Regions:
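Carbohydrate-recognition beta-sandwich/jelly-roll modules
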Residues: 1-245, 250, 267-269, 285-288
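Aromatic- and carboxylate-enriched substrate-binding clefts and catalytic-loop regions
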Residues: 64-73, 81-84, 242-379
Length: 379
């Protein structure tokens, strides 16, 4: 490459090839020499042409619960969550698909760890553009990036989904609901449940972006465990059927505070004793009980906070912010998270709290973190 008259040794190779047996088309981007420039994003291969305003021309995106966008869709596609990073709420599965009537393709990113997509659809169309991009891992492109295209004749979005399912099965990563239930029988208990989302304690730190100094009553809230127990009994008596209670803010620090040092149960709300009564009530009624927990947001206010366990960038800095209720925070390196999970759930078990489930925010929603601390380097 030559940049502003200076030659740099940065080099990469691109390959496009067809597997004869399957007729799948592979696009590969391979870094050869990463000296001279720092690559931020690679947009390759380019977007497919889908330019006509036709209702049966459409695009499939794995955004949140899934999106199907006809080319004449009246609504503009605005910002995609997490900038379309694969394996986040913006792209839960690493593929997208487009159809012109009954003919189309599915593009599967087989190296999704530092990759995502971008898409554009203006109000009323007449087109939808979607393409893949690759980003560095700890400052380097580092490894081969691959997208596999499969052409589909006389098919639709169902065929695209089946092709991805077959791909995942071929990789040994498919796990159906039946297989999950065979491993954890309580998965079947979720069938027919109504989901109830409730909280116990909210406490907003004064330095938090959420803190409202003009309306202090909005910052903090407390509901005793006994109140939640009473509500669950009443719903049961009214014939609500099987319930799953997801409980936020059940611990002493309050919702989104002092993670990963979250126990004990909120004393003001009745402590372990009343939390156990709530859990026992749910079990007696044939309902399910689960908690919200967190092992990513790493709060400065946590007693065990140690900057050495926070995610570190390649320049040595540690990202911080104060967006959530708990105030100033960094991100806990995920290599360390299992130790805190074991510690906290052992404490819950010691206090005889029966849990049917737990939601560990935000591993299945946010982009994966990387950490350049040599003691626990993580890509």
């Amino acid at each position: 490459f030559e940049i502003e008259g200076t030659k740099v040794p940065y080099a990469f190779e691109t390959y496009a090839w067809i597997e004869e047996t399957t007729e799948d088309i592979f696009f590969e981007w391979v870094p050869i020499c990463e000296e001279g420039i720092t690559v931020e994003k690679v947009f390759w291969p380019g977007e497919m042409e889908l330019e006509e305003k036709k209702n049966d021309w459409y695009t499939l995106l794995n955004m949140q619960q899934g999106v199907l966008i006809p080319n004449d869709w009246e609504t503009e596609l605005t910002a995609i969550p997490f900038d379309g990073f694969f394996e986040t709420a913006g792209g839960y599965m690493p593929w997208f698909s487009q159809f012109k009537g009954r003919n189309g393709y599915i593009a599967i990113c087989t190296t999704p760890w530092n990759a995502g997509y971008q898409a554009e659809h203006p109000e009323n169309g007449p087109y939808t553009h979607v393409g893949v991009r690759f980003e560095p891992s700890l400052g380097r492109m580092d490894y081969k990036r691959v997208v596999r295209y499969t052409l589909i004749e006389d098919g639709d979005y169902n065929d695209a989904c089946k092709i991805y399912r077959d791909y995942v099965r071929e990789q040994g990563n498919l796990c159906t609901l039946n297989e999950k239930a065979a491993r954890v029988a309580s998965v079947d208990d979720l069938i027919g449940c109504s989901f109830i989302h409730k909280g116990i304690k909210t406490f907003v730190q004064p330095e938090s972006d959420f803190f409202d100094p003009e309306n202090p009553d909005k910052n903090n809230n407390l509901t005793p465990f006994a109140v939640r127990t009473k509500e669950m009994k009443e719903l049961h008596e009214l014939g609500a059927g099987k319930l799953y209670l997801h409980l936020d803010g059940w611990a002493e620090p309050g919702y989104d505070n002092k993670h990963p040092d979250y126990t004990p149960a909120c004393e003001e709300a009745g402590g372990w004793k009343d939390m156990k009564e709530l859990a026992d009530t749910m079990q007696k009624q044939g309902d399910l009980f689960g908690i919200h927990d967190q092992y990513r947001d790493y709060y400065f206010a946590a007693e065990s906070f140690d900057e050495d366990y926070a995610c570190r960038l390649t320049d040595g800095t540690i990202p911080t912010h104060k967006r959530w209720a708990g105030g100033q925070q960094s991100y806990l390196c995920a290599t360390q998270a299992p130790h805190y999970v074991k510690r906290n759930f052992r404490e819950i078990e010691k206090n005889q709290i029966h849990l049917d489930g737990a939601y560990l925010d935000v591993f299945t929603c946010n982009e994966g973190d990387e950490c350049n601390n040599p003691r626990h380097r993580m890509t």
